[in-house]
Curated annotation (Swiss-Prot):
Keywords: Disulfide bond, Secreted, Signal, Toxin. It comes from the Eukaryota. Residues 1-21 form the signal peptide. Its main location: secreted. Expressed by the venom gland. Disulfide bonds join C23-C35, C29-C44, C34-C67, C54-C75, C69-C81. This is U8-theraphotoxin-Hhn1d. It holds the Pfam family Prokineticin. GO terms for molecular function: toxin activity. Belongs to the AVIT (prokineticin) family. It comes from Cyriopagopus hainanus (Chinese bird spider). One of its GO terms (cellular component) is extracellular region.
C-alpha cells in the first residue's frame, strides 16, 4: 500500500510540473526560454546551447521541435547550434 501511495504522489508531482511549464506563446516563458512543441502540447524550453538541437528564429516565434540558439550561436542547416 505504501508503494502505491508513493507512486501516486510522484505521478501527481510530475503532472504538476508538466502543467506549470505549459505555454501558449513566447510571452508565457521566462527569459532564456521559448514556447515550443506541437499545437496541443507546448512547453517553455531553454534556448539551444552549443551542439544542441535548434530551430532558426522566425518572425512569428512559433517553434515545434526546439528553440532558437542562445546569443552568439547560430542554427546550422542540420538544426544544431554552433558558433556564429
Amino acid at each position: 500500500m505504501k508503494v502505491v501511495l508513493i507512486v501516486c504522489l510522484v505521478w501527481v508531482m510530475a503532472m504538476m510540473e508538466l502543467v506549470s511549464c505549459e505555454c501558449w506563446s513566447q510571452a508565457d516563458c521566462s527569459v532564456g526560454h521559448c514556447c515550443a512543441g506541437s499545437s496541443f502540447s507546448k512547453n517553455c524550453r531553454p534556448y539551444g546551447g552549443d551542439g544542441e538541437q535548434c530551430e532558426p528564429r522566425n518572425k512569428y516565434e512559433v517553434y515545434s521541435t526546439g528553440c532558437p540558439c542562445e546569443e552568439n550561436l547560430m542554427c546550422s542547416v542540420i538544426n544544431r547550434c554552433q558558433s556564429a
